[in-house]
Amino acid sequence: MESQQLSNYPHISHGSACASVTSKEVHTNQDPLDVSASKIQEYDKASTKANSQQTTTPASSAVPENPHHASPQPASVPPPQNGPYPQQCMMTQNQANPSGWSFYGHPSMIPYTPYQMSPMYFPPGPQSQFPQYPSSVGTPLSTPSPESGNTFTDSSSADSDMTSTKKYVRPPPMLTSPNDFPNWVKTYIKFLQNSNLGGIIPTVNGKPVRQITDDELTFLYNTFQIFAPSQFLPTWVKDILSVDYTDIMKILSKSIEKMQSDTQEANDIVTLANLQYNGSTPADAFETKVTNIIDRLNNNGIHINNKVACQLIMRGLSGEYKFLRYTRHRHLNMTVAELFLDIHAIYEEQQGSRNSKPNYRRNPSDEKNDSRSYTNTTKPKVIARNPQKTNNSKSKTARAHNVSTSNNSPSTDNDSISKSTTEPIQLNNKHDLHLGQKLTESTVNHTNHSDDELPGHLLLDSGASRTLIRSAHHIHSASSNPDINVVDAQKRNIPINAIGDLQFHFQDNTKTSIKVLHTPNIAYDLLSLNELAAVDITACFTKNVLERSDGTVLAPIVKYGDFYWVSKKYLLPSNISVPTINNVHTSESTRKYPYPFIHRMLAHANAQTIRYSLKNNTITYFNESDVDWSSAIDYQCPDCLIGKSTKHRHIKGSRLKYQNSYEPFQYLHTDIFGPVHNLPNSAPSYFISFTDETTKFRWVYPLHDRREDSILDVFTTILAFIKNQFQASVLVIQMDRGSEYTNRTLHKFLEKNGITPCYTTTADSRAHGVAERLNRTLLDDCRTQLQCSGLPNHLWFSAIEFSTIVRNSLASPKSKKSARQHAGLAGLDISTLLPFGQPVIVNDHNPNSKIHPRGIPGYALHPSRNSYGYIIYLPSLKKTVDTTNYVILQGKESRLDQFNYDALTFDEDLNRLTASYHSFIASNEIQESNDLNIESDHDFQSDIELHPEQPRNVLSKAVSPTDSTPPSTHTEDSKRVSKTNIRAPREVDPNISESNILPSKKRSSTPQISNIESTGSGGMHKLNVPLLAPMSQSNTHESSHASKSKDFRHSDSYSENETNHTNVPISSTGGTNNKTVPQISDQETEKRIIHRSPSIDASPPENNSSHNIVPIKTPTTVSEQNTEESIIADLPLPDLPPESPTEFPDPFKELPPINSHQTNSSLGGIGDSNAYTTINSKKRSLEDNETEIKVSRDTWNTKNMRSLEPPRSKKRIHLIAAVKAVKSIKPIRTTLRYDEAITYNKDIKEKEKYIEAYHKEVNQLLKMNTWDTDKYYDRKEIDPKRVINSMFIFNRKRDGTHKARFVARGDIQHPDTYDSGMQSNTVHHYALMTSLSLALDNNYYITQLDISSAYLYADIKEELYIRPPPHLGMNDKLIRLKKSLYGLKQSGANWYETIKSYLIKQCGMEEVRGWSCVFKNSQVTICLFVDDMILFSKDLNANKKIITTLKKQYDTKIINLGESDNEIQYDILGLEIKYQRGKYMKLGMENSLTEKIPKLNVPLNPKGRKLSAPGQPGLYIDQDELEIDEDEYKEKVHEMQKLIGLASYVGYKFRFDLLYYINTLAQHILFPSRQVLDMTYELIQFMWDTRDKQLIWHKNKPTEPDNKLVAISDASYGNQPYYKSQIGNIYLLNGKVIGGKSTKASLTCTSTTEAEIHAISESVPLLNNLSHLVQELNKKPITKGLLTDSKSTISIIISNNEEKFRNRFFGTKAMRLRDEVSGNHLHVCYIETKKNIADVMTKPLPIKTFKLLTNKWIH
């Protein structure tokens, strides 16, 4: 709505120019070229004479004949006031005012401005001649007053009094912004035209039709200044006025030029966007038209690229050309010329054979030329309000016809317009009814009329959001003072008087109603097309009718002026109002179901949908009349308001029309929703939905990821389901352009099945509206269901499933049927449905004990798809079950009472509704059923291994399952359940996202050992393992065992009187989830453990200690204890936050725990199986059912969860066993050959550097006398076995230097040419790390040396020949080798013997026994790696002395002398080391990784979100046989070798935190599935993200007298294939991590304790060797320690009893470990699981735990 408000001039009356609730100003849509002087009638210079006799004063200047002039009125009659929206007023050229022209009948009192004070301002005087209309024009229009009942002025009387009636012109609006100036100029030009000044307006060429007079210039100047304030003028206008402030004509001329240019460009863009071609015109003409438009736009600076142009052209193709949309849309680089070649080909084919049909595509029905315009299309305003004006030869003044003339015209019945109407009803004037339509409502007392309004009609407005009328005559059920805010285009409020209904009665007897607002402050009665669309009525502007979506014509549309109108004759007066639904009387004698109850029962669907469903019997068991609908209209569901909050309505009508021609289940829409974050790993993160185009039947499937194979499985499932269940074949599937749909795998699958994929265009989500809206609707329902029920978020897909079942059964208001009915299925029986989250009690037919409660509290989710049962969530068991054995818990409406639904309770309604079903349940309760143990059809949510919050008030004390009193003996008060709601846990535990959550895996375990083991990684409880106990007392447990057995029989119950509930850390799967359970007292724990542990070893001794250190020998002094405690003191263990006590809910105390033997797994199946069972029962618990075990294991195969190893018994089939003729894998080559580096190298600079390196190498070879230069041998004379091929290799080093090396092909060397017993030794990495650690602690100088061409210093004993280098040009000759050339098998061993001999004899060094290439004397330690030497010494001069000796024999380079006291940087054997003596040492590989990783061609994400961990728990590798061709297999194996090779190099150097992932993935190098590659990429991505991490060492405390060498051990029991265990060890010297190892156990362990023993036994040999090395290099005493988090293992080590070892393998391993610990004086100590940093070696950990365990030693 546009309001003309002259706020800058308060003395001038305000007026309203037009009325609309759209933001479009009605006068701004005229073609800009229509305002030029060439289309305006020439100005008639004849003017009427001035009325010189009339005297005018400011008090009597109004013209009495015009009712809108403010005539003098009595004091008692106030002037009409309309606030900011006054009645319609006009502007007049009044000559009777000598002081100026009159505006709105008031005397001119325009204040003088600086412009008016200029000499160019000519105030009009009495003789001034203002423009007047010629007398032949006729009577000008005038608007009636509110008091007048006549609409038009009598023509005859007006003619007789021409001198007293003036022409009143609508003033232009005020300019309020520089951006609005172009639109404002249009209205200003129209104002000049209506003022008979059209002749002075500049034409297109900038010249007016006639010259402007001085008076006209004054008039033009004044009006421009008033309505265009200078502060709102654009800059270019101000620039013109700054030169000549009166040059208004130049401003108008430039404005018209801009309008013309913008119009041409806009027309071209509109034409291009609305192209249509079906072959009816020659293809050449169509091509010429399109190319001309594109060229014109490009020339004007609007670039249209080929992609956009092709999309626009293809969108307009129809008929035989339409298929080009689908055959060409995949060509990303398609050009317009290529597209027109296809169009020409089809056109020529049509001309040659019109009757033949193309055979290269499916021939769907041709798209109908439906020009129907929907109200919510992308251009509603252009279609509905402002269509393109038709050319009209009549002048503007033709509107002023006489009323009597129009009334004498013949008339016809306009209502006879039928569907075939194609010509618009064009009214040039409201009196010119050339179709004879009668104005039946001209006498209605409207408040306002505009001069271009068609009386008796409603203006159709596509942009208006609400319908507004000025008369209350047609408003039904009106209510006053509505709280509604309506604003116009300028965001100004429009006061609303009332709201009601506007009722229509159309010509086909259709009755409907819409909401209407009443306000007198508008110029038109507006009918909103948006509100008509809501009642299934659309406006077709090609037929000019209102019609329903099925094409039924309801009423004609009349075009008058620029707008379209519909007659008010179809409105029903308010005196025949029909009673509304609110007036329906409800009988008190009949109890009806309350609507809020039904609303919640049916998944919170809206009232209209529910009523349609009941009316059409898609919901059975009760009728529409059984529901109380009195509150349906005004009812607001709080859960719906929260869960279904949305932005705006979805745009309708976006699908292609031809889709309607498909049969049921032939055209599917699909889309993927997700991910949902912060959920357990067992819960799905995505779901994929499918919708049938014809029936609107919906399917949803859960997904854990969006990988290709996951999507392919779902597609295979649904296609098979449709084929078998509905005997239909899917032809087309519409989907978006996500990578999960556009991948090659799915494309081949669809192509193989003959299915056409239909993709949406880029960024065009509207074209995918069916699937997008379904996902949004289901998500709204999901949020609402979870909000209402209070269930945890990990059950979100159950809410989706419930909503899908219900919505498939609800009728569509449009089709009057449900999706199930369309699909030919029976309706949904609501008596079998429960509200989502309805509290129930599930029967446990097989409890642990006969005295245990038989009922388990649960929450109903949705009907089962695989049985007649119901899927119910059991929080206490953390699982869902499919069962019919449940009872509805009365009085529990979940969260329904939280919002105060008028204190409604639905117990009685629910009982009546499910009465028949209760009888069915009761009749089956006596049967022994196993359906409680049948998993849901969604196994991803079964057996959720987590500890979420216990349900708040899961059972009130009145219904406590521990109460032994029968229900019949309770009092009446006790029978009624407490009003406190039973509600599911609101959320999962906060740490659940970091936990190892998986379906439980049932494995057979040995009962004798299942409970003594405290943990696989620390244990479930803190056990009373005796600490610091003498070995001599280890047998005393036998005497106490019998006495304690009896006590334990009574300790199974968890009553508060017997148990102290305190916080005890629970080892989650993998020992990573910090939760608490009620702790049992020390004495009670000991009783239970000893009683339940007829174990492999003796039970612990009785006496306890507060220490956590268990020595192998009996400690007799305090000093020994302090020594053992000091072992842990300086280790880089994580600091754990203090645990705050947590009070557990009453239900946990009241309900006895239902125990499980479940185990969890994580990445690689790596988790703990040590679920601690507290009740010894021979009966299997609810979770131990065999059926459940089978389903749970099958779940691993169907979940598509990414992981490393599935712990299942199915034998793994690697591809290497199935693929034949895989001879070898090409080695990884990082160097260049001679031809690559020199011959064909196009990089001139690099080529020159390689040539230089080549000559340098040749010179070095000659200098070292590498071969015999005295004689050349003929090839035929030498034994071929002794001829070694040679070659030059080139590479570029990290420091930028280019190097060449002449090498022998040792890979094809004959075995007879070398001694296989010789060894080529290099320094062990542990020796280097040990030396570096000791150097830091002892302030050593570190010197780095390099011996050039080291191998060439070693003589060769064998007779070998090689071909000469290429530069010699002797290809047929051979030369004999004299030195150990690089590449020969024996060269390394020869060099080692040579340098070893020199160091011992000439340098006074000796080699450390057991550690090759480590040499020492009293002052210096040397680590040798081929030609690199690292020297360590406390005296730098000692190092220099060694260097001097080496230079006497070898070409020795000093890389880094290490003499600075500041930080020194080294590059030692790939490690980038930062060393400051006496302070710290940092080891990393940032520069190396920055250079190498990008060369691996791994899809890195350098700017995206960085990974926080190298993997995540709960992921499994699918071991199904891989189908792949041989070439692709070799390529992928080669890629895996490169990736894992680099990762191994980095991991074993210093990134010990990655060793578990590297070790697991390395086992799959020969199984390069897509999943394995993805996980390898993820590992490389993590290495890239953390390439700046360093291994941090700090100098040991100087007060420490001894060196401390510690091995920390851990094991994950049975988490590898074939139930092998993963073991890991970390080695620390003086608190610095120097090494780590992660590997799979060589034998199958049968318990957690056995796995821990195996891990410790693997660490002992290396620990002893390192101990010897440390003692050799540093003469300090050494303390050795073994740390483990398994107290049962410690108990075995300190025990002397071996009678209960169950087998000899375990026994021998344990006995050997006892001997090693005892003989090597090892201190075995206990470490808490949460602090066990070796945990990272055995399993994937959550992000939080991974960081906690590693942030102290690597960061």
From Swiss-Prot:
Residues 1338-1476 form the Reverse transcriptase Ty1/copia-type domain. It is found in: Cytoplasm; Nucleus. Signal peptide: none annotated. The active site is at 461 (for protease activity). It catalyses: DNA(n) + a 2'-deoxyribonucleoside 5'-triphosphate = DNA(n+1) + diphosphate; Endonucleolytic cleavage to 5'-phosphomonoester. Residues 1-10, 48-60, 127-152, 1005-1015, 1054-1082, 1101-1111 have a biased composition (Polar residues). Residues 1038-1053 have a biased composition (Basic and acidic residues). It holds the Pfam family rve. Its EC number is 3.4.23.-, 2.7.7.49, 2.7.7.7, 3.1.26.4. GO terms for cellular component: cytoplasm; nucleus. GO terms for molecular function: aspartic-type endopeptidase activity; ATP binding; DNA binding; DNA-directed DNA polymerase activity; RNA binding; RNA-directed DNA polymerase activity; RNA-DNA hybrid ribonuclease activity; zinc ion binding. A motif (Bipartite nuclear localization signal) lies at residues 1178-1212. Mg(2+) 3 binds at residues 1610, 1652, 1685. It comes from the Eukaryota. InterPro entries: Aspartic_peptidase_AS, DNA/RNA_pol_sf, Integrase_cat-core, Retrotran_Ty1/copia-like, RNaseH-like_sf, RNaseH_sf, RVT_2, TYA. Residues 1610-1752 form the RNase H Ty1/copia-type domain. Mg(2+) 2 binds at residues 1346, 1427-1428. Residues 660-835 form the Integrase catalytic domain. Initially, virus-like particles (VLPs) are composed of the structural unprocessed proteins Gag and Gag-Pol, and also contain the host initiator methionine tRNA (tRNA(i)-Met) which serves as a primer for minus-strand DNA synthesis, and a dimer of genomic Ty RNA. Processing of the polyproteins occurs within the particle and proceeds by an ordered pathway, called maturation. First, the protease (PR) is released by autocatalytic cleavage of the Gag-Pol polyprotein yielding capsid protein p45 and a Pol-p154 precursor protein. Residues 583-640 are annotated as: Integrase-type zinc finger-like. Retrotransposons are mobile genetic entities that are able to replicate via an RNA intermediate and a reverse transcription step. In contrast to retroviruses, retrotransposons are non-infectious, lack an envelope and remain intracellular. Ty1 retrotransposons belong to the copia elements (pseudoviridae). The capsid protein forms a homotrimer, from which the VLPs are assembled. The protease is a homodimer, whose active site consists of two apposed aspartic acid residues. Capsid protein (CA) is the structural component of the virus-like particle (VLP), forming the shell that encapsulates the retrotransposons dimeric RNA genome. The particles are assembled from trimer-clustered units and there are holes in the capsid shells that allow for the diffusion of macromolecules. CA also has nucleocapsid-like chaperone activity, promoting primer tRNA(i)-Met annealing to the multipartite primer-binding site (PBS), dimerization of Ty1 RNA and initiation of reverse transcription. This is Transposon Ty1-DR5 Gag-Pol polyprotein. It comes from Saccharomyces cerevisiae (strain ATCC 204508 / S288c).
